[in-house]
Amino acid sequence: MTTINESPQWNELSVVLTSAPDSPAATATIEALRARVAAVPGADALVGGPTAIALDTDRGAAHDRRIVFPLVLLVVLAVLGLLLRSLIAPVLLTATVVVSFAASFGLSALIFRYVLGFAGTDQGVPLYAFIFLVALGVDYNIFLMSRAREEAQRHGLAEGTRRSLALTGTVITSAGVVLAATFGVLALLPIVIMTEVGISVALGILLDTLVVRSILVPALSLDIGRWMWWPAPLGKSPPEPMPSDLKRPLATPPAGR
């Protein structure tokens, strides 16, 4: 069915496609129409409609991801490098954040498709989930690895890693669980994109907190050893006295004969 609306300034040609608006065939039709219109000399026309809007949204989201993802990772690498004074540790920690995002988004896609019955994932969800997970993952990385460096200088690499995990594990795990529950509440909203963002971020935080930060990062740190902190030397200073040692009374010397 074709409808033509004319005015002195413009003409509108309305066409109903035989394919479903969200089908690949409809997308191919829109692309073909745009190519035909662009090939006409002096033509000044636009191809719109639901399929065209969805196509432009997808392309815009993909363009944003190609710019934002590398830019965010470069900024994170620079910040971690300045804080940790290392080249290897920031690369490793940034890689674990990317792994957390990829795993959580893959798991979320399965939930959206086979549990919730969604037709697909909104194009804005990957960008939102990536920004949230990178920001939160970097915070936990800084907490853990800053303490790991301090403890390694006092007690050696293996013992320092164990102590840093024991000292920061409760805080990181508690914060991660609370934050995951907060984002999980978004899944109760009757808005698909909010549901998808909430589930993706909540799963990512739980994976990052319970698996990556608690198991993967300490294990990789022990495997890499002192190269983790290259090129800064990881010197070992004597352990600082504990508060219990400071409060312990000094032994009185034996009385002289």
Where are these regions (language model features)?
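Interfacial helix-loop-helix hairpins and adjacent transmembrane helices
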Residues: S214-R257
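Membrane-water interface of transmembrane alpha-helices in multipass transporters/channels
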Residues: R85-A95, Y114-F130, L188-G204, L216
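Hydrophobic, glycine/alanine-rich multi-pass transmembrane helices and their short helix-loop junctions
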Residues: V79-L80, G169-R226, W230
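Helix-loop junctions at the membrane interface of multi-pass solute transporters
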Residues: F143-H155
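Hydrophobic alpha-helical segments of membrane proteins
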Residues: F69, L73, A102-L110, Y140-L144, ...
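Hydrophobic transmembrane alpha-helices
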Residues: L77-L80, V98, G117-N141, A181-G184, ...
